[in-house]
Amino acid sequence: MSKRKVAIIGSGNIGTDLMIKILRHGQHLEMAVMVGIDPQSDGLARARRMGVATTHEGVIGLMNMPEFADIDIVFDATSAGAHVKNDAALREAKPDIRLIDLTPAAIGPYCVPVVNLEANVDQLNVNMVTCGGQATIPMVAAVSRVARVHYAEIIASIASKSAGPGTRANIDEFTETTSRAIEVVGGAAKGKAIIVLNPAEPPLMMRDTVYVLSDEASQDDIEASINEMAEAVQAYVPGYRLKQRVQFEVIPQDKPVNLPGVGQFSGLKTAVWLEVEGAAHYLPAYAGNLDIMTSSALATAEKMAQSLARKAGEAA
């Protein structure tokens, strides 16, 4: 099966890590162009050393390159504001081009591969939510397939060193996009997301805490669902793991808790603690937040490439 050519816009931490993953592990993808805006960026320099065509003139530079004619899929690892402009420009030049959005812009539907990739494989633009979303939404979905989820709250703690300027500029968008995706993809009636940039030295690995309030259900069934979901995520993010056993607390009807925006709640509280270790393709292993974003985007693009190849075969 012929490989589909891809470009990456954004030569920062996420874009560079993704490029290395495609070059090393791409099965149906061929790395064609790395796009940046800083001619001195490490990502562009590394791309050139690895034999990848580059431009430092942004999306306009990409569209002016001869390689652009053959590109089927573009990853955007810039910022939420830039992605809106990039999508418009690329869509005008190539209406059927596929965009995988690694910013919180969310023009297209949210995609968390283990939960809803099959439903979104033919979309022209998919949004990879956020690193916190990719790590925690599978856990919310694991509970919601067993019991009705009224509220889910996630806290993502990442090493400050792993957060580049794009991540820092998009903190508000991070919380908004993740909260919404907890509801839309995770199945919670109400979602909340919190991000912590941990300045500790040496840097600590990505840690995520997930609290889910649901109708009462079998705790064994919920724990089994969570363990099964964690294994499914590990298929494309090997460093993803439960830090300890799932914890449960029954909130009785005569002692309900009051949730802002939700009201009185009684039922089952499920607590999940996660750790995400990075594959250290570009940044060290503590940057699991980068790894889960780039691994999820890669898994999505691989499925898209297979779908495009099948369609091309059917058309022929």
Curated annotation (Swiss-Prot):
Gene3D superfamilies found in the cross-reference section: Dihydrodipicolinate Reductase, domain 2 (3.30.360.10), NAD(P)-binding Rossmann-like Domain (3.40.50.720)
Matches recorded under Pfam families: AcetDehyd-dimer (PF09290), Semialdhyde_dh (PF01118)
CDD domains (UniProt xref): ALDH_C
Reactions the enzyme catalyzes: acetaldehyde + NAD(+) + CoA = acetyl-CoA + NADH + H(+)
Pathway: Aromatic compound metabolism; 3-phenylpropanoate degradation
InterPro entries documented for this protein: Acetaldehyde_dehydrogenase, Acetylaldehyde_DH_C, NAD(P)-bd_dom_sf, Semialdehyde_DH_NAD-bd
Function: Catalyzes the conversion of acetaldehyde to acetyl-CoA, using NAD(+) and coenzyme A. Is the final enzyme in the meta-cleavage pathway for the degradation of aromatic compounds.
Annotated family: Belongs to the acetaldehyde dehydrogenase family.
Protein name, UniProt field: Acetaldehyde dehydrogenase
Organism, scientific name: Escherichia coli O139:H28 (strain E24377A / ETEC)
Gene name tied to this protein: mhpF
